[in-house]
């Protein structure tokens, strides 16, 4: 019985440990929520960078348009200068130099525009990656919340079963003690009846020696013997019934021990699943 009580105490401690782990998982959920908010902030920052990159791209396009306009103006000036080749040779040379400078600037502008486009593409890819990771984190958080609810339900169910097992065990202990008392009383009664039979046997021997006893007394003694014999049989039956009751109570106690052991194994399996989930979250 002490072993069963110790097992019950151990189950209570395991239940409390399961509740503590549930609290730890709630704290882990809060931490994951904070990480998700941080990532959303990073996504917003990337969006701002993309907007700035778009602004830079627009400015580069405006610069390119200005350079194209200047190039068209230079072509017009060169066309007009062809009519005055002799007089405008030096001026044409200067315009050609301006054209080379403009072309160089145009090339630089196009290079910057290409770099800005690459930066915008990289920012878009980074934003999509963060969105995917945020979705995965949300799914993981939902799964963890479901596991936490299941753990609480199992802990409550185990607590109810523990109370029911303790109640049945207390009843079984009372019945067992009563059966033991009845068995002791039956054994005492058997001894008493055996002593009475011994006395009756001695009396019968005395009656056999004393043949002068009346037939009425002899019949009375025979009736007493039959009565005592019936009482002995009844006592033996009660003793047998008491032994059967004790065996039945012992089987119930064994069954309760098996139930307690099964609940302990269930707690152990649940603890392993929760620890594995926590390890996966930590590794993630």
Swiss-Prot record:
The keyword Repeat applies. Transmembrane segments: none annotated. Keywords: Coiled coil, Repeat. Residues 1-284 form a coiled coil. It holds the Pfam family Tropomyosin. It comes from the Eukaryota. Belongs to the tropomyosin family. Tropomyosin, in association with the troponin complex, plays a central role in the calcium dependent regulation of muscle contraction. Homodimer. This is Tropomyosin-1. It comes from Schistosoma mansoni.
């Amino acid at each position: 019985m002490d072993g069963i009580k110790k097992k019950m105490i151990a189950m209570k401690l395991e239940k409390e440990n399961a509740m503590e782990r549930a609290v730890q998982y709630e704290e882990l959920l809060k931490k994951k929520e904070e990480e998700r908010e941080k990532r959303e902030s990073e996504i917003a920052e990337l969006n701002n960078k993309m907007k700035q990159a778009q602004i830079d791209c627009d400015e580069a396009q405006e610069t390119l348009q200005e350079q194209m306009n200047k190039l068209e103006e230079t072509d017009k000036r060169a066309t007009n200068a062809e009519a005055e080749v002799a007089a405008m040779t030096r001026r044409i040379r200067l315009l050609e130099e301006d054209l080379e400078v403009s072309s160089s600037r145009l090339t630089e502008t196009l290079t910057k525009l290409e770099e800005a486009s690459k930066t915008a593409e990289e920012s878009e890819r980074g934003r999509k990656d963060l969105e995917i990771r945020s979705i995965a984190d949300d799914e993981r958080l939902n799964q963890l919340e479901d596991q936490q609810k299941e753990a609480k339900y199992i802990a409550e169910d185990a607590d109810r079963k523990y109370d029911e097992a303790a109640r049945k065990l207390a009843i079984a202990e009372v019945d067992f003690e009563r059966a033991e008392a009845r068995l002791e009383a039956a054994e005492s009664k058997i001894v008493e009846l055996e002593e009475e039979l011994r006395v009756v046997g001695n009396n019968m021997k005395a009656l056999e020696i004393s043949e002068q006893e009346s037939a009425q007394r002899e019949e009375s003694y025979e009736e007493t013997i039959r009565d005592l014999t019936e009482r002995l049989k009844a006592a033996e039956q009660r003793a047998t019934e008491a032994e059967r009751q004790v065996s039945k109570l012992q089987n119930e106690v064994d069954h309760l021990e098996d139930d307690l052991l099964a609940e302990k194994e269930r707690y152990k399996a649940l603890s392993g699943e929760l620890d594995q989930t926590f390890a996966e979250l930590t590794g993630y």
